[in-house]
Amino acid sequence: MSAWVLALFSLLHTAPSLSRPVLPHTALAVYISADAGQSPAPLEYMKRELSGIMQSAGYRVVYGDPRKPDTAAGFSKLVVLELRGNCGMPPGNYRLERAVASGVSLAETSVSSGVVMPFSRINCANLTRTIGPLLADEAGAQRDYFYGRAMARVAAHEIYHVTMGSQDHSHEGVAKPSFTVADLLDERFDFDRVALAHLRQSAADVASRP
């Protein structure tokens, strides 16, 4: 296990468009690992959308770099999110090199001996092949916006597994087993009521620990 992963584990402790509801929040650290050439615009849109989704679930997302963990913060919940590949679509013509297969994975979270680990990965090549054809005619800034928002929804799904410590899914919303293209690109896509109740209870349980 690398030094920065060990450092991130040391941060964990047991101490105490349409608007989304504002709730008391439990701090959730999301450490993002991306290629050096990652375009910042889709990433910023992803952060904005992800913060809103998790806020409604009772979590306040704090972003960081896994190579420079904040050892003084003492976050209650922590996720390392790796962005694999080129996460975005540059301005200009878009050519679909290979169609995405039905049921292809957009992301995954590590599981060890049945235990959900706080390490998730987004497969941006598969995401691009999924939504790229619908964004081909959009201007560069709009592509960044829609792409970043789609990334956030995929990330929120994986973070659900990490925060709940479970591989289970809901029947609807962000925590359901698979997404449609509409889920990724529609104006609004959130956790359903059942998933929200579970997440809010989890956040409250963490916040109440002595």
Name what the model sees in each region.
Residues 40-159:
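Metzincin-family zinc-dependent endopeptidase catalytic domain
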Residues 1-29, 57, 97-116:
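Disordered inhibitory propeptide/activation segment of secreted metzincin zinc metalloprotease zymogens
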Residues 2-3, 8-9, 55-62, 82-88, ...:
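Generic ordered-secondary-structure signal
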Residues 9-14, 52, 60, 150, ...:
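Aromatic-enriched hydrophobic runs in primary sequence
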Residues 18-22, 31-48, 110-150, 162-210:
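Metalloprotease/metallohydrolase-associated module, dominated by Zn2+-dependent proteases
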